[in-house]
A protein has these predicted regions:
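Acidic, divalent-metal-binding catalytic cores of TOPRIM
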Residues: 157, 172-288
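Extended helical coiled-coil dimerization/tether regions that scaffold
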Residues: 2-100, 105-114, 126, 275
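A generic structural signal for well-ordered alpha-helical segments
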Residues: 39-40, 139, 256
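Switch/communication elements of ASCE P-loop NTPase nucleotide-binding domains
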Residues: 67-205, 222
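Active-site-proximal structural scaffolding
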Residues: 32, 96, 125, 148-149, ...
């Protein structure tokens, strides 16, 4: 359970199997280094197991203490205990720190071949959610299958940057007690990550909106969103997404269609000059 993974755990003799991630930290220095490095990237604090505490091992946060040279072993134990006892404890921190550390402890432990993580972005600020996504999709989790439910575009963007060749995105919507599933497979993901305009657009955010309105430019998006907010303020606001010119509508339309996302195309009148442009996006009443 990643919600409680960072809570103190019983000290386990080395001859016995490790019963949890904190016990594993005591035996695997590379595992500790990965966990501490990931946490430091998010919060600028190292993770230090306090093996000197007694029967329970809590996780401390701060800089790893270094004992003075030539200090006898008994004094080293006292020094480390006193120093670490003054450090903040991981399980006393807020929900964001605890959840981040708990997930990192679980995914880096390499104890499970399949994992289900529900909304790992919970309690995290957007930059930390993006970092969490990159950690989840990194090579450190290769060889395992992770099922992630999320409502965070930041988490998804982090995953796309870190491991685009490992990701499939399933969009689930529900209407009239019927679930609808739409899939972006590895090839579709590659189209996004290999195209600079798509990669750095807000396309992923379409997953979390009922409708996306495609416009040619940022100024068009702002203009039409202003009209929407004025005329239809009581209705859910669609995502207004600039595509960078009428010749790029088709790329966005293809991906939105595959994800079963309702969309509208708002183009300038000069799109009518080129039959190819208009045919590429014309679908029932989706073009204005």
């Amino acid at each position: 359970n990643w919600h409680t993974a960072c809570f103190p755990q019983k000290s386990v003799p080395r001859k016995d199997p490790a019963t949890g991630p904190i016990a594993l930290l005591a035996r695997d220095s590379s595992y500790l280094e990965k966990v501490s490095s990931a946490f430091y990237s998010a919060f600028s604090l190292e993770v230090i197991p306090n093996y000197f505490n007694g029967s329970e091992i809590p996780l401390c946060l701060g800089s790893t203490p270094i004992s003075p040279k030539d200090m006898p072993v008994p004094q080293i134990n006292d020094f480390m205990y006193e120093t670490l006892s003054s450090y903040p404890l991981a399980h006393h921190q807020g929900d964001g720190m605890r959840s981040f550390l708990g997930i990192v402890l679980i995914i880096y432990a390499n104890q499970y071949t399949s994992m289900f993580i529900d909304e790992p972005e919970s309690f995290l600020h957007p930059p930390q959610a993006k970092l969490m996504g990159s950690l989840i999709a990194s090579n450190e989790t290769s060889g395992r299958q992770l099922f992630i439910s999320t409502h965070s575009k930041e988490l998804l963007n982090g995953m796309l940057e870190s491991g685009p060749d490992r990701i499939q995105v399933v969009r689930i919507t529900r209407a009239n007690d019927v679930n609808d599933f739409a899939l972006l497979d590895v090839d579709d993901i590659s189209k996004i990550t290999s195209n600079t305009l798509l990669k750095y657009s807000d396309l992923i955010n379409s997953l979390f909106h009922e409708r996306t309105v495609l416009c040619e430019s940022d100024s068009d998006c702002m203009f039409y969103q202003l009209i929407w907010d004025t005329v239809r303020a009581s209705e859910p606001t669609p995502l207004f997404l600039p595509v960078g010119g009428k010749g790029r509508f088709k790329t966005y339309v293809d991906l939105l269609s595959k994800l079963h996302i309702d969309y509208s195309v708002v183009a300038d009148a000069d799109i009518l000059r080129n039959p190819t442009d208009i045919k590429s996006v014309l679908l029932q009443d989706n073009v204005v």
